[in-house]
């Protein structure tokens, strides 16, 4: 399913108007991995929140296939989020009172599967992300990288159309960040998951197929990785940021 963002704008205030987004347009093709970069206040979080149906656009439209996000009712949006979106946050958002496996099972329970189906799917995901041996551990008993891999497993448990990641490596050390980014790459290439990731980190952005630059609420530049290796793409990103 392609996701189309068409002339999306967002403004706050009625007297003193602040424009967070200004006519932003792009398409996330099915199975694409896109990173978004930009300085603080450039509109990255506002854009992610609108695509996630957490916030509404002041103008423009967002389409997931034929479904128009910006005109849907609150009830339809809630159902849409449950069935089509996965989320990975900087602070993991795992429930501390549940084991890693139970955190994944909780997400699976929203889809009315049988207990056997949920356990099989949870095992499959945990094995794929290398955390099956930690299934009975609680979040405070594992590392930040292991928590984030659990968050990734939870995010794709219901096969979402799109995973939204907001600074997912922000709280991780360099080794854990690399493992997580390789996990994202696996989600994208092997599981064909579409990913939209907001990041300040050039190393993280270099794992994407395409990079969007936001500045003052506008989409000002796109870089495509094409067949470049990651190090070459990373160097190209640094060159762009130095201009």
What is each stretch, according to the model?
Residues 1-2, 243:
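Short, Lys/Arg-enriched, disordered terminal segments
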Residues 2-214:
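ABC family nucleotide-binding domain
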Residues 218-242:
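Conserved beta-strand-loop-alpha-helix hinge in the C-terminal portion
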């Amino acid at each position: 399913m392609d996701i189309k963002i068409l002339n999306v704008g967002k403004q706050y205030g009625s007297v003193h108007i602040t424009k967070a987004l200004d006519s932003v347009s792009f398409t996330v093709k099915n199975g694409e991995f896109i990173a978004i970069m930009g300085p603080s206040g450039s509109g990255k979080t506002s854009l992610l929140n609108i695509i996630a149906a957490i916030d509404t656009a002041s103008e423009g439209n967002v389409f997931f296939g034929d479904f128009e996000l910006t005109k849907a009712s609150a009830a339809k949006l809630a159902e849409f989020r449950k069935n089509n979106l996965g989320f990975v946050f900087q602070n993991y958002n795992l429930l501390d009172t549940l084991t890693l496996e139970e955190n994944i099972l909780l997400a699976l329970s929203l889809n009315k599967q049988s207990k056997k189906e949920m356990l099989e799917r949870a095992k499959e995901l945990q094995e794929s992300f290398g955390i099956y041996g930690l299934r009975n551990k609680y979040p405070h008993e594992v590392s930040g990288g292991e928590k984030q891999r659990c968050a990734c497993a939870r995010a794709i448990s219901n096969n979402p159309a799109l995973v939204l990641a907001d600074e997912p490596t922000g709280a991780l050390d360099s080794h854990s960040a690399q493992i997580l980014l390789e996990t994202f790459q696996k989600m994208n290439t092997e599981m064909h998951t579409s990913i939209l990731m907001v990041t300040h980190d050039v190393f993280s952005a270099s794992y994407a197929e395409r990079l969007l630059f936001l500045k003052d609420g506008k989409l000002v530049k796109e870089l495509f990785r094409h067949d470049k290796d990651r190090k070459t793409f990373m160097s190209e990103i640094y060159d762009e940021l130095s201009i």
